[in-house]
UniProtKB/Swiss-Prot annotation:
Its EC number is 2.4.1.353. GO terms for biological process: antibiotic biosynthetic process. Keywords: Antibiotic biosynthesis, Glycoprotein, Glycosyltransferase, Signal, Transferase. Residues 1-24 form the signal peptide. Coiled coil: none annotated. Pathway: Antibiotic biosynthesis. Glycans are attached at residue 207. It comes from Sordaria araneosa (Pleurage araneosa). This is Glycosyltransferase sdnJ. It is an enzyme of class 2 (transferase). InterPro entries: EryCIII-like_C (IPR010610), UDP-glycosyltransferase (IPR050271). One of its GO terms (molecular function) is hexosyltransferase activity. Pfam families: EryCIII-like_C. Optimum temperature is 30 degrees Celsius.
Length: 512
């Protein structure tokens, strides 16, 4: 290691897709080898970091002693972690989905409250103190914080440290209110509505209602109590952030680009759009040669609804119906389906799958996997994927956009509805469950996650994007638009640009 080099300290959670922007940036920082790298996160991230370091050593052909490394600090060491983890352990991923718009606004407000009041005051302040002690000990030139760890934002700001936010998603929700003329009410779809852009006039009343409902949590007693505890602890008197905390004068590094987002004229200097910040991944030829052999058989639709999605039997049935509609119309197409079933309905889900797609599975036209060995980016860039069906997660959206592959979004929660809006606005795919999602009504007092997929609607979206035949002009135009946008993304810099910004901030060579 070089003496007296500046260091950067990352604070991040370890969720698989969410943390990819951090891993991608660290990969490039390791290749540059100009700064020392520390990361505070949870234990599941450590093996991925170790693999990343080994990949860089292999690529640079440096010896173990001379290779740069990453210093890992276990975020679970803060004293309040055990209590916090115990409170969160019973949450089921399959119960997260909610409708868009008016019918889901109450649920969005509740989930936003949980994001703001992410911990009880005692735990929040415990993480604040722990991260402050670590920062004082390491004295990094730069602190990098992910959007969710609000105590670490507070720490960096209160200690007066130079810090930046590395986002896995667009910061549009933080920028839209800056566009003027109250356009967040009448022009831009409110968070989690899935409304088209520009907003249709008839949707304005519901849009305003959803926008205001999502803000109500800021006055909730839990948030008020946490704010009081923060201020009493000496934390600078700024209100809690949001899903996309936007702070004046704090660099915001994002995987977005103007070309892949909703149009906004007022973008501050401290927002650095890098384009998709994707992890370095081995080609599919080495990571899963068996899958590559199967992909080479026919044009393939990739169905993968994200790390956190677990499908109840009813959802499995409706997805299977949509896939069957495509296969019946397009005998030249096959489907790779990453399917993770919800545990209590796994048997009935399997029965639904076999009754609807049993023959196609036997014939090898449908391949189901609970996990994909190859990285999604490697699969998307194999040249064999004609459509990516995903849940609208930011990571999935940016991966498919970068790869130049048409998309269908089966939106499930939070901002996934917003990425469905982007896909349709940009002409690179379809919102595959708009009507079903809009028709769902839930009981807030006895909440049961609804099925948000209708097989017929999903099948129609597949035919629209993949085409009813090889010469379908509508599908050809969608593919053309996706390919053009992919070329823009791949020229944008992505993880290289993100690492350049981090390095520039460490050395004080970047204006913002």
């Amino acid at each position: 290691m070089h003496a007296k080099r500046p260091s950067v300290l990352f604070f991040t959670i370890s969720d698989f897709g969410y943390v990819n922007v951090v891993l991608a940036t660290i990969y490039e920082l390791l290749l540059r080898d100009e700064v020392d790298i520390h990361i505070a996160s949870f234990a599941p991230l450590k093996p991925r970091l170790e693999s990343l370091v080994q990949l860089v050593k292999h690529e640079t052909k440096k010896s173990t002693d001379s290779s740069p490394g990453v210093h890992f600090h276990n975020l679970a060491d803060f004293p309040g972690f055990a209590t916090w983890a115990a409170q969160s352990k019973d949450r089921k991923k399959a119960d997260v989905p909610h409708p868009p718009g008016r019918n889901g606004a109450g649920r969005v407000a509740l989930l936003t409250l949980k994001a703001l009041a992410i911990m009880e005051p005692e735990q929040y302040l415990s993480l604040f103190d722990w991260s402050a002690d670590l920062t004082r000990k390491l004295n990094p030139a730069l602190v990098m914080v992910d959007p969710i760890l609000l105590p670490c934002h507070d720490m960096a700001r209160t200690l007066g440290r130079k810090y930046a936010v590395l986002h896995p998603w667009s910061v549009a929700d933080g920028l839209i209110p800056r566009q003027g003329w109250w356009s967040e009410y009448w022009k831009y779809p409110a968070f989690s509505t899935g409304f088209p852009y520009p907003l249709p006039w008839g949707k304005i009343p519901e849009n305003i209602s959803c926008y205001l409902t999502s803000k109500q949590c800021h006055s909730h007693p839990k948030v008020q109590a946490l704010n009081q505890a923060r201020y009493s602890h000496g934390i600078k008197p700024d209100p809690l952030g949001s899903f996309t905390p936007f702070a004046e004068g704090v660099p915001q590094i994002t995987p977005s680009l103007p070309a892949v987002d909703l149009p906004m004229g007022n973008i501050p200097k401290n927002v650095f759009d890098c384009g998709p910040i994707l992890v370095a991944s081995p080609p599919i030829e080495t990571s899963d040669p068996d899958l590559l052999s199967w992909l080479r058989r026919a044009p393939t639709v990739l169905v993968s609804l994200g790390t956190h999605f677990e499908a109840y039997a009813e959802t499995v049935r409706e997805q299977a119906i949509g896939i069957r509609i495509l296969l019946e119309a397009r005998p030249d197409v096959q489907v790779l389906w990453k399917l993770k079933r919800e545990a209590t309905s796994e048997k009935s889900g399997q029965e639904n799958l076999e009754s609807i797609l049993g023959q196609a599975i036997q014939d090898g036209r449908v391949r189901t996997e609970s996990w994909l060995k190859a990285d999604p980016v490697a699969i998307l860039r194999s040249g064999h994927i004609v459509c990516s069906v995903h849940h609208g997660g930011a990571n999935s959206y940016f991966e498919a956009t970068w790869a130049g592959v048409p998309q269908i979004v089966l939106a499930m929660w939070y901002d996934t509805f917003d990425y469905a809006t982007r896909v349709e606005y940009l002409g690179i795919g379809a919102y595959g469950n708009r009507e079903k999602g809009r028709s769902c009504v839930v009981d807030e007092d006895n909440y049961v996650a609804p099925n948000l997929v209708d097989g017929e609607e999903f099948g129609a979206a597949l035919l629209r994007v993949v085409g009813r035949n090889r010469a379908d002009p509508g599908a050809a135009q969608i593919t053309k638009s996706a390919v053009i946008l992919g070329e823009v993304c791949r020229r944008s810099g992505g993880r290289v640009r993100s690492a350049e910004i981090v390095t520039g901030l460490c050395f004080g060579k970047l204006d913002y």
